[in-house]
Amino acid sequence: MRILIIGATGLIGTPVARALEANHEVLRASLNGSALQVDLADPESIRNLYTKVGQVDAVVSVAGQTVSRPLSALSDADFDLGLKSKLMGQINLVRLGIESLKDGGSFTLTSGQLSRRPIPGAVAVSVTNAGVEAFAHAASLELPRGLRINAVAPGRVSETLLALKMDPALGTPAVEVAQTYVKAVEGAMTGQTLDVVKSSS
């Protein structure tokens, strides 16, 4: 398959690209640091990306910005960032990419388990993630030509915990998170949210 990955240079996007390129042609795109550049907050940037890459079999989004702050400190701008970048950015990635996807192709979006397992200080993130999941479920009922759409919901990532000086064993290594994206791309499911489950080993 020919697969376009958005956010391919990020903490999760990098291992996702590596895992998929073992058996597929991978096109890497990101805001910075890759040959193909795209800003999810800018619909015109998304249009330009699809014009450059042409037809693909799958689009994987591992991108989008959000803000984590206590509810009392959140501003309209904080909510707007996540809604414009992570939510509407991924919605537009689908809306503007339908014609670029081959018959039977797939969109894989990124939400997060905070949508259903909230924690203090992450209200804006939870709202954005829930929107991504709702969109994937609803859009699956309307996509033409056998196109599929799913959302992957990572939880705590070991490398992020380590950077925060927390126990990385409480999270899932990014290379393991990547396997859920591979499952979404290579599988047959649609309209699903795939939770990244921490390995018991």
Report residues per predicted region.
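Rossmann-fold cofactor-recognition segment
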Residues: A29-S45
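Conserved NAD(P)H cofactor-binding loop of Rossmann-fold oxidoreductase domains
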Residues: V60-R69
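Substrate-binding pocket helix/loop in short-chain dehydrogenase/reductase
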Residues: P70-L71, D78-D80
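C-terminal helical subdomain
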Residues: P144-L147, A151, S158-E159, L164-S201
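Conserved Rossmann-fold cofactor-binding substructure of NAD(P)-dependent oxidoreductases
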Residues: L40-V56
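Catalytic loop of short-chain dehydrogenase/reductase
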Residues: G82-L83, I91-N92, S106-V132, A136-L143, ...
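N-terminal Rossmann NAD(P)H-binding glycine-rich loop of SDR-like oxidoreductase domains
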Residues: L4-A19
